[in-house]
Regions:
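Extracellular-facing segments of soluble proteins and assemblies that are Gly/Ser/Thr-biased and enriched
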Residues: 98-184
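Short helix-loop boundary/capping segments
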Residues: 155-223
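Secretory targeting and sorting signals
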Residues: 2-33
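Short, surface-exposed beta-strand/loop "edge" segments at domain boundaries and coil↔beta transitions
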Residues: 86-98, 139-143, 157-161, 177, ...
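Short, hydrophobic/proline-enriched secondary-structure or compact coil segments at domain edges
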Residues: 80-84, 128-134, 148-150, 241-250
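Ser/Thr- (and often Asn-) enriched beta-sheet segments in non-cytosolic proteins
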Residues: 77-79, 119-121, 127-135, 186-188, ...
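Solvent-exposed N-terminal domain segments of exported/luminal and surface proteins
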Residues: 34-97
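Long, compositionally biased interface segments
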Residues: 213-267
């Protein structure tokens, strides 16, 4: 059986540390431009930030760790990365995702920057697109997915309220990882085929588009995916796309992601 995703309530974007920080052994990443290994901390790359999101570190062994770094930036295009070594302290929690190191644009239970171009109302006709070229390395076998995670809110300024929905776009996965919910359709978006899963057994509904063919280089229009949901699956078009994130959900294993080219365009 594929592990089911235990959905998270992420850390406030502005926090530099949380109570989880003491739950991990922090091991520095190899000589990168600007690195943090502190749970909940981030590296700013305005309008993005790279978040060391270790939201389930309390379920991990004491020797587990994670680091994120910002490497370079040219306008709206950034180069960033993360590495980790995660293991569950108990088999009883092995189905829970432990962390999601990610590049964040927009809202994450708060705002880091005000000039992100987000949120946009889903009915506005505006487009949000992204390019992502990355290298994924497994030092040991990982249970993981490489994905976009997008928060949908009912308000343009949700504060610290929960979102109305979550939309994930999985580019790759392995080690038995599977999305939450059940598959309801296979759809074509941006010239590719995606298996759509919907989970309503959660605080908010989760929509997951899983690539039929995995890729390490993508150019996607994020709002083309929201159009599928507003057009056929009941997502309210008066809601807002408030956040675009790109990262790795890690259940277990030692690995690294190098995002060689990453950008989000709001137009």
């Amino acid at each position: 059986m594929s592990p089911s995703i235990a959905r998270r309530r992420p850390l406030l974007a502005g926090l530099l540390a949380t109570a989880l920080a003491g739950a991990v052994l922090l091991v520095p990443a190899a000589a990168e431009a600007a690195t943090t290994c502190t749970s909940g901390a981030s590296e700013g790359m305005n309008p993005y930030y790279i978040l060391d999101n270790e939201y389930n570190a309390s379920l991990a062994t004491s020797s587990s760790w994670q680091c994120v770094w910002s490497t370079s930036q040219s306008g709206g295009t950034i180069d960033w990365g993360a590495d980790w070594d995660w293991a569950h302290a108990s088999p009883s929690t092995s189905s829970d995702v432990l962390a999601y190191p990610a590049a964040v644009l927009g809202w994450e239970w708060g705002w880091m920057y005000s000039d992100t171009g987000l949120p946009i109302q889903l009915s506005s006709g505006k487009t949000v697109s992204s390019t992502w070229d990355y290298t994924f390395t497994q030092n040991t076998s990982n249970t993981f997915d490489v994905s976009y995670d997008n928060w949908i809110t009912s308000s343009s300024d949700p504060g610290d309220s929960n979102p109305q929905a979550e939309m994930m776009i999985w580019l790759d996965h392995g080690g038995g990882a599977g999305p939450a919910g059940s598959q309801v359709a296979t759809v074509s978006v941006d010239g590719a085929s995606w298996d759509l899963y919907i989970d309503t057994d959660n605080t908010w509904p989760i929509y997951s588009f899983v690539a039929a063919s995995t890729t390490t280089s993508s150019s996607l229009t994020i709002t083309d995916f929201t159009k599928v949901l507003t057009g056929s699956y009941g997502l309210n078009s008066s809601y807002y796309l408030s956040s675009v994130q790109a990262g790795v959900e890690v259940w277990t294993g030692e690995g690294q992601i190098d995002s060689n080219t990453y950008s989000v365009t709001v137009g």
